[in-house]
Amino acid sequence: MKPFHTALSFLILTTALGIWAQITHATETKEVQSSLKAQQGLEIEMFHMGFQDSSDCCLSYNSRIQCSRFIGYFPTSGGCTRPGIIFISKRGFQVCANPSDRRVQRCIERLEQNSQPRTYKQ
């Protein structure tokens, strides 16, 4: 019976931590949405790629970066398998980009130079 109790305890702990991570992520997402709405008057729809609900990670990069369509960005978390920059478009979509790509770096520089700071770091 001991393996059963161990497995049951692990399952309960995993479920509890998973719910906590979802609540934390939902709170952070609402904070980013509120910040963008206050600055741009936009209602943001968040789209997440992959199965990791507790953090935003890029599974692939978009090579077609059009900086004029973005209002902000934030880096992926340290828990992701690959580094990434997630740009937020004027329409509220998230676009993953390769942080070592020179076009991505120039876009970040432009966003930082525009009127108000618009980096949304988690």
Swiss-Prot record:
Chief localisation class: secreted
Keyword hit for Secreted: yes
SMART domains membership: SCY (SM00199)
Cross-referenced InterPro entries: Chemokine_b/g/d, Chemokine_CC_CS, Chemokine_IL8-like_dom, Interleukin_8-like_sf
Inducing or repressing factors: By interleukin-4; in the bone marrow macrophage.
The entry's keywords: Chemotaxis, Cytokine, Disulfide bond, Secreted, Signal
Entry keyword Disulfide bond: yes
PTM comment text: The N-terminal is proteolytically cleaved by proteases associated with inflammatory responses. The processed forms CCL9(29-101), CCL9(30-101) and CCL9(31-101) exhibit increase in CCR1-mediated signaling and chemotaxis assays in vitro.
GO biological process: immune response; negative regulation of myoblast differentiation
Disulfide topology: 57-80, 58-96, 67-107
Listed GO MF terms: chemokine activity
Signal peptide location: 1-21
Family matches, as CDD domains: Chemokine_CC
Tissue and organ expression note: Expressed mainly in the liver, lung, and the thymus, although some expression has been detected in a wide variety of tissues except brain.
Localization per record: Secreted
Assigned GO CC terms: extracellular space
Family: Belongs to the intercrine beta (chemokine CC) family.
Biological role: Monokine with inflammatory, pyrogenic and chemokinetic properties. Circulates at high concentrations in the blood of healthy animals. Binding to a high-affinity receptor activates calcium release in neutrophils. It also inhibits colony formation of bone marrow myeloid immature progenitors.
Protein name as annotated: C-C motif chemokine 9
Lineage: Eukaryota, Metazoa, Chordata, Craniata, Vertebrata
